[in-house]
């Protein structure tokens, strides 16, 4: 490994090891980043399901994305301190096929989703769970787990030979814990790795029988094409441009079929915007330049801007992160 990458590795490891294991275990799994309602995490699970059952569950996938939009809109209302009565008024308006209540405009994607569901449905539950006098309590877990239950039931009797899967920068099993909870994990021979030993200890405590390792994305200790597919989230923005290119080369080297990549800080511009923050980076990446890098190694690179995707598919213009992207890479 080049000396500059060794130094960057040390800085990255130090930046994460400064945090406690409890904080790391809860990182990126709450609020709008909760993988049950985060669109990038949902699309990643759909990517995995399509690897083993291509096209089989398209309608369910569409409804799960709609579910995420409904819950995220509800979270926005709760942040604005709506009351339990106001939430019930929203449900009454939906039942009466109205698009506003007491001056609160109900987005069309909410109305369309409600109309597509039989009664009673999860929207009825979501907008009646809170006590009349307050909405301070969090949304109930059983409601957030709506599609976890759906997928577990749908996949329960499915069979498939395990597909080898790699996740660099796995954190404290941030996404894997939901891949497992949704009944998807058993179709994959999974390996997750991270630079931060505390993350790996957290992951192993949750999943003692799974393969979680301390490894370095700049030098992956695996043969060429060792894994059928790979997914990785929120990694490349934190690397220097040179290190990022090395990491991409390594991930592509060890992956045989397809890669799903989530970005949190990307834009439709010509050049990367490099921003060093303390001992690591918080870069704004160019979608076009990143696509070109992956096309050096792959047969096809699909770029999905989450904001544009949700607007064109569902008419939703209320995403929380305009810089969120997903790349689907076919090797």
Mark where each language-model region is.
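Conserved acidic residues
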Residues: 163, 228, 257
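Short catalytic micro-motifs in class I SAM-dependent methyltransferases
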Residues: 234-238
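A conserved beta-strand element that flanks and buttresses the S-adenosyl-L-methionine
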Residues: 231
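A short glycine-rich, Lys/Arg-flanked "PGG" loop and its adjoining helix->strand segment in the class I
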Residues: 245-257
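Class I (Rossmann-like) S-adenosyl-L-methionine-dependent methyltransferase catalytic domain
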Residues: 2-221, 239-246, 260-331
């Amino acid at each position: 490994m080049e000396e500059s990458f060794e130094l960057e590795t040390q800085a990255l490891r130090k930046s994460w090891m400064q945090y406690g294991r409890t904080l790391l275990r809860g990182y990126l799994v709450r609020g709008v980043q909760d993988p049950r309602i985060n669109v990038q995490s949902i699309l990643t699970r759909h990517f995995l399901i399509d690897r083993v059952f291509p096209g089989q569950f398209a309608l369910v996938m569409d409804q799960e994305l709609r579910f995420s939009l409904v819950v995220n809109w509800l979270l926005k209302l709760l942040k604005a301190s709506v009351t339990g009565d106001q939430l019930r008024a929203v449900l009454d308006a939906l039942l009466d096929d109205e698009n506003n209540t007491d001056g609160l405009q109900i987005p069309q994607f909410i109305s369309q989703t409600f109309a597509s569901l039989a009664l009673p449905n999860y929207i009825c539950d979501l907008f009646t769970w809170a006590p009349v006098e307050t909405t301070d309590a969090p949304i109930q877990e059983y409601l957030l787990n709506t599609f976890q239950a759906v997928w577990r039931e749908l996949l329960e009797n499915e069979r498939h030979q395990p597909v080898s899967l790699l996740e660099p920068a796995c954190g404290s099993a941030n996404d894997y814990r939901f891949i497992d909870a949704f009944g998807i994990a058993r179709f994959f021979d999974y390996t997750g790795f991270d630079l931060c030993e505390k993350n790996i200890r957290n992951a192993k405590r949750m999943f003692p029988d799974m393969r979680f390792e301390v490894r370095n994305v700049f030098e992956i200790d695996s043969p060429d094409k060792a894994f059928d597919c790979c997914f990785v989230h929120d990694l490349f923005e934190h690397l220097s441009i040179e290190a990022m290119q090395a990491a991409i080369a390594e991930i592509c080297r060890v992956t045989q079929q397809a890669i799903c990549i989530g970005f949190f800080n990307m834009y439709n511009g010509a050049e990367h915007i490099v921003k060093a923050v303390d001992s690591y980076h918080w870069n704004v990446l160019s979608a076009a330049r990143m696509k070109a890098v992956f096309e050096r190694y792959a047969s096809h690179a699909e770029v999905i801007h989450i904001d544009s995707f949700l607007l064109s598919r569902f008419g939703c213009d209320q995403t929380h992160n305009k810089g969120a992207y997903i790349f689907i890479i076919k090797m």
